Amino acid sequence: MNFKQFGVLLSVSTVLGMNLIPTKALTQEEASIKFGQAIASPRCAVVDQLVGEDARTLSVLFDNFEAKDGERKSCNVRVNTTIPSGYRVKDMRILYQGSTEVPSGTKGTSLSRSYIFNSGAFGIVKDSPKTTKFTSSNELFQEQDEITAASASCGGEGQFGINASVQSSPETYIAIGSPDFTSEVKIHFDLARC
């Protein structure tokens, strides 16, 4: 190969490389979700919420979502969201973090939850209610649910809802959250192009 051929080859590769690099960078960019303020009721409160770096994950920090000595407390959370145009919600992962104290000889504690979607941006929940029973103490438990959304809609606004309750038996305790207020519930959305 002579110097002229090498120069032409180098020029062609440089031009092609310059065109491919921005294209590759643009295709790797992830779509982001806009989250509204999380609202909780009747017997819990949202202390804070944090959007993850991927803009598809929302961490919700609670206050007073606990039950002890035979109590049952419920917490209903609603979050308005905007799904970007050209995308639909495919799957979701919801991670609960908490602690429970279950002395030997007691009936234990439980965490129950179900999910609802309001509006076309999410479609229909394809998941049944879940209950996790704890029969021993655990300073930091993690329970993760994976749910599928069946949406024909492409982008738009919607509301994601969690209906959760914690149940204790006499002499037991359960809380969603931890003393250092690390994230209690993390909600992650997987999106698909439509």
State where each predicted segment sits.
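Short beta-strands within extracellular/lumenal beta-sheet-rich domains
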Residues: 71-85
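Internal, hydrophobic beta-strand segments that form the core of beta-sheet-rich folds
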Residues: 154-171
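Proprotein-processing/basic-patch segments
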Residues: 168-194
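Short, surface-exposed tryptophan/glycine-enriched loops
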Residues: 126-158
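N-terminal leader/pro-regions and domain N-caps
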Residues: 24-68
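C-terminal segment of classical bacterial N-terminal signal peptides
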Residues: 16-24
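A short beta-strand element within beta-rich, extracytoplasmic domains
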Residues: 88-102
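Short, surface-exposed beta-strand/strand-loop-strand elements in extracellular ectodomains
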Residues: 104-121
